Regions:
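An N-terminal-biased, well-structured beta-alpha scaffold segment characteristic
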Residues: 1-91
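Phosphate-binding beta-alpha-beta segment of Rossmann-like dinucleotide-binding domains, i.e.
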Residues: 86, 94-142
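Residue in the alpha/beta-hydrolase core beta-strand immediately N-terminal to the catalytic nucleophile
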Residues: 69, 142-144
Length: 144
């Protein structure tokens, strides 16, 4: 049975998916680079987010490793040259954060448009500056 290490915090759904597909999963999220290097030889797969750095030293120590999955868009925390040299496939999820990014962008735009940050700051100081809090209304306008 293939064995995967999840070394960064992920939803428990990830574990369920692996287990439904007869893949043994260990989730160890507090590993130091040295700790990861010591145990990586026991795994066929490694799942990371951005905290774990899959360096050449770690990848080279992973004699059974076949794949590194990055739960996120970038792969800057994975040594791609080392992965290629060691015949390790690297995959990511480039569209996984699209909705969250769009929602965050719209939230920031609305915050700017309605002066929410300034209003919050003033309220915490005990001020109630109605003119600053008013902001602008969207009715009849296009935003974005």
């Amino acid at each position: 049975m293939p064995k995967v290490l999840i070394s960064d915090a992920l939803s428990n759904l990830a574990n369920e998916i692996f287990e439904k597909n007869n893949i043994e999963v260990d989730t160890i999220t507090d590993l130091s680079p040295e700790g990861l290097k010591k145990i990586i030889e026991n795994y066929d797969g490694l799942v990371v987010r951005s905290a774990t750095k899959a360096t050449d030293e770690i990848i080279s120590a992973a004699k059974k490793l076949k794949i590194i999955g990055r739960a996120g868009a970038g792969v800057d925390n994975i040594d791609l040259i080392s992965a290629k040299k060691n015949n390790v496939i690297v995959m990511n999820t480039p569209g996984g954060n699209t909705n969250a990014t769009a929602e965050h962008t719209l939230s920031l735009l609305m915050s700017l448009y309605r002066n929410i940050t300034e209003a919050n700051r003033g309220t915490h100081k005990g001020l109630w500056e109605k003119k600053i809090f008013k902001g602008l209304e969207l009715k009849g306008k296009k935003l974005g």
